[in-house]
Amino acid sequence: QIDADRLALRRKIEESLGRLEKETLISRNGENYFFLTNEERDINKEIKAVDVPGGEESRLLGSIVFEDVLKGARKHRYSANKMDFDFNRRCDNYPIGNQRDGGLLFSLITPLSDDYDAYDKAKCILDSTAEGGHILARLGNDESLGRELRTYLQTEKYVAHKNDGTLIESTKRILRDCAEDNRQRRDRLTVLLGEMVAAAEFFVAGQPLKIKAVSPEMVLWEAMEYLVKNSFTKMSFLKKLTPEADRLKEIQSILRSNDIAKEQLLFQKGEVNPEALEDLRGYVDLSSRHPPPLVPHALIETRYSIPPHAWPDAAIP
């Protein structure tokens, strides 16, 4: 009974504080509330009136997740062979940062999306098969997320616009306080979104994925490992990868030496990847029976550098 009374009292207090905040009589920063002076009230009313166009909140959320929480990661190094894979980032279908041709994809669906409720398990599974298969992460809902993001954007815009060097000292102080509150707000958002990413539902290339990792960065690593492994199923045909510079240097040296024995040895070395050679021979044999003729450069770009192969150019036998 005591706990129930406390919960009821807490709800009443929160409702009262919410009304005072809505009327701009108090200001909120996290779990702290402050009564406002007349000038502070006027400024806070102006901040609340700042327009935030559609999509800006999702772009900010995506920027915080991918740049702050995930430390700006744009590549994944696959553990089995140390190959690097670029990946693109999206948040509620808005691109975050430059998009790289041929990159993998990590798509984030958040409560800010108009279609959030439509992303049930079946839709998440289906959508994750698009574009050759990608990572789709659906964040859980948190009632403070949208409010904090919107307040952050409104405050940032207002302070930047208002700071023109002609303000009286009391107004400058209020704006400095607003900017400091916003810095703390972004820190809170980074922590909150880190927790939300770690707890998100993940779907990869048409399969729900139960993530074992607990930190956001390791969650990303685990999802990327699964995506690469299941997208590039013939990548394992390359048992040995020779660094491109070393391979070219070796070939040039042997050809210049005009040593037939060494040349024969060079070609024998190619057999360290017999499955890859067999795959290539089979495709070349099949293609040679039908026009148009094969072009090596096009062969690499249209077949062996994309799923299911992802073979480095220099490693193609």
Regions found by a protein language model. Give the residues of each.
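Extended alpha-helical interface modules used as scaffolds for assembling large macromolecular complexes
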Residues: 1-317
